[in-house]
């Protein structure tokens, strides 16, 4: 990888803990997702949480819309190790119930949680049990008076919603919280976060809400979150996709990886292919991405179909392949090796080399 990297001066925020995961301060930016199963389907929800954990999720959020779901949460919490956030809307009593069951964080929506006395009840409970809170402002559920005041969701409206609830928590002498101001429009979300970042010191949870399907949602999230992260704004993030939640974690880490903020797994450098390719680049990359999903150790692997750009990319990669006639050149740590790969068996050979280097470089295969 090129040594050129602009300096990102990260916004200084206070640090809180969601379970054992630090958020804010100098902590790594945490990547989280949310289950899309029925919470009352305990088996399916636990399975999905474990799938998210396998691809590197730091935190998982669960919707808890009813008291039945709260009872299910109790069982779910007992079966997983990853920190769980309970997503609470409308009924503050559900927050009090999951607090009894060991929830690691409570997400409340100012637009629908109700009067200040209800917020006070949640805060008193959170204080007593040392549970952090996320104030989750959303453009789609802004308080009625703010909608009337501003005419539509605006950055100023989202900021005002957030600050009025930050003020309540401050008044109650509660500082273990993070804040989000999400919108489905990139410009609205980005400007809202910029204003919020200047106004408070608490950690910020980033997200472009309801971003869309797997492709469009990933692009929209990369643009919006990328803008903020490059400015040093953000302490944890969730990519919202109408897709398998596992994809949210992958995209989240890809965004951080692209900005070289947090490394996770294989960074594939691959050409878009043309008639010069000497092997099936697209098929090779797709196969290796699937086979190597379990690898979380950071590594740059270049897969280039010909000798035009292949050698140059391989020089700045941990491992590299440059297409050749029947056999392709192999690079290790930027140096050309005598060994060459048979194009017909390139996928298997390259996978073996990558796994061998991971075992040598990082036996625990850990996330950075």
From Swiss-Prot:
> Which GO annotations describe the biological process of this protein?
isopentenyl diphosphate biosynthetic process, methylerythritol 4-phosphate pathway; terpenoid biosynthetic process
Q: Which UniProt keywords apply?
A: 4Fe-4S, Iron, Iron-sulfur, Isoprene biosynthesis, Metal-binding, Oxidoreductase
- Annotated residues that bind [4Fe-4S] cluster are located at 271, 274, 306, 313
The record's function comment reads: Converts 2C-methyl-D-erythritol 2,4-cyclodiphosphate (ME-2,4cPP) into 1-hydroxy-2-methyl-2-(E)-butenyl 4-diphosphate.
* Pathway(s) it belongs to: Isoprenoid biosynthesis; isopentenyl diphosphate biosynthesis via DXP pathway; isopentenyl diphosphate from 1-deoxy-D-xylulose 5-phosphate: step 5/6
Q: What is its EC number?
A: 1.17.7.3
InterPro entries in UniProt: Dihydropteroate_synth-like_sf, IspG_bac, IspG_bac-typ, NO2/SO3_Rdtase_4Fe4S_sf
Q: Paste the cofactor note.
A: Binds 1 [4Fe-4S] cluster.
Q: Which residues form a coiled coil?
A: none
Into which EC class is this enzyme placed? oxidoreductase
Pfam families (UniProt xref)? GcpE
Q: Catalysed reaction(s)?
A: (2E)-4-hydroxy-3-methylbut-2-enyl diphosphate + oxidized [flavodoxin] + H2O + 2 H(+) = 2-C-methyl-D-erythritol 2,4-cyclic diphosphate + reduced [flavodoxin]
MF term (GO), any: iron ion binding
Q: What is the protein's given name?
A: 4-hydroxy-3-methylbut-2-en-1-yl diphosphate synthase (flavodoxin)
Q: Where is the signal peptide?
A: none
Q: Which cofactor does it need?
A: [4Fe-4S] cluster
Q: Which family does it belong to?
A: Belongs to the IspG family.
């Amino acid at each position: 990888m090129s040594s050129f990297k602009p300096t990102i001066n990260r916004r200084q925020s206070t640090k809180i803990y969601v379970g054992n995961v630090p958020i804010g301060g100098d902590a790594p930016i945490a990547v989280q997702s949310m289950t899309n199963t029925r919470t009352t389907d305990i088996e399916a929800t636990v399975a999905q949480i474990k799938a998210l954990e396998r691809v590197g999720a730091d935190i998982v959020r669960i919707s808890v819309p009813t008291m039945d779901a709260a009872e299910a949460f109790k069982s779910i919490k007992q079966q997983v190790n990853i920190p769980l956030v309970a997503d609470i809307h409308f009924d503050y009593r559900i927050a009090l119930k999951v607090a009894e069951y060991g929830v690691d964080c409570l997400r409340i929506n100012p637009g629908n949680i109700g009067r200040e006395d209800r917020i006070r009840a949640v805060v008193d409970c959170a204080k007593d049990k040392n549970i952090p809170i996320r104030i989750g402002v959303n453009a789609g559920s802004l308080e009625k008076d703010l909608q009337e005041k501003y005419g539509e969701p605006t950055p100023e409206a989202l900021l005002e919603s957030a600050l009025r609830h930050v003020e309540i928590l401050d008044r109650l002498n509660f500082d273990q919280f993070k804040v989000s101001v999400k919108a489905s429009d990139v410009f609205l979300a980005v400007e809202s976060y910029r204003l919020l970042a200047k106004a408070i010191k608490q950690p910020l949870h980033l997200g472009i809400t309801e971003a869309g399907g797997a492709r469009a949602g990933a692009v929209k999230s990369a643009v919006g979150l990328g803008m903020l992260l490059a400015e040093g704004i953000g302490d944890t993030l969730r990519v919202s996709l109408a897709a398998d939640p596992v994809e949210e974690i992958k995209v989240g880490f890809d965004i951080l990886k692209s900005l070289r903020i947090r490394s996770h797994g294989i960074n594939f450098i691959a050409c878009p292919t043309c008639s010069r390719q000497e092997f099936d680049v697209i098929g090779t990359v797709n196969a290796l991405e699937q086979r190597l999903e379990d690898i979380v150790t950071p590594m740059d692997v270049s897969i280039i179909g010909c000798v035009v750009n292949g050698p140059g990319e391989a020089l700045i990669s941990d491992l590299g392949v440059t297409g050749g006639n029947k056999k392709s050149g192999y690079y290790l740590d930027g140096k050309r090796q005598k060994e060459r790969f048979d194009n017909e068996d390139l996928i298997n050979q390259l996978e073996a080399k990558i796994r061998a280097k991971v075992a040598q470089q990082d036996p625990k295969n850990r996330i950075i």
